Amino acid sequence: CRELEARVELTQNAFTKLWDPQHEHFYNRDEFTGELIRVPTSACFLPLFAGLAGNEQVLKMVSTLENWMDQKFLLVPSTAPHEPSYEPERYWRGPVWPHINWMICEGLSDYGFDDLSRKIRMQTLELISKLGFYEYYHPLGESGLGGSSFSWTAAVCLIWDNSTNTR
């Protein structure tokens, strides 16, 4: 039990080192330099899923998601639309990934942001319904990308279909 508690504490401490109070984002960290990689990505929202974000951090993440939504992008692009490295069809540089959206939606609901979670879920399901079970999608809903019969996309649909009555 103590070993497990120590691992949990290590994980919590690691997450606190990923928060950048100046930019109000969780960021990835370069393993070699130790520097934060200050590019907002969909990974910035995964602390919601882990349950490791504080209340102020959650509010900042929700604000960021709403800002991205106001820019007419379907959520959640894998790289922030305003970033120079954003490319809507390039692997992990802009497309929407259903399994990442599922984790973000779960986290949003866990923190009480059911309306935003529902919006993201519905946008994602509409993309899948319109375009098919692709690996990932153009963030403006223009096309499905990558593999065209992707099991994790189907799994996300099944999970959301089975949880409709519980959320």
List each model region and its residues.
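Inter-helical turn/loop segments and adjacent helix faces that build the functional surface
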Residues: C1-E3, Y111
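Alpha-helical support elements that line or immediately flank enzyme active sites
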Residues: A43-G54, N101-D114
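Hydrophobic transmembrane alpha-helices and their immediate junctions
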Residues: R118-T124
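Extended glycan-interaction surfaces of carbohydrate-active proteins
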Residues: Q12-V96, Q123, S129-R167
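Short acidic alpha-helix initiation/capping motifs at coil-to-helix transition points
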Residues: A6, V96-H99
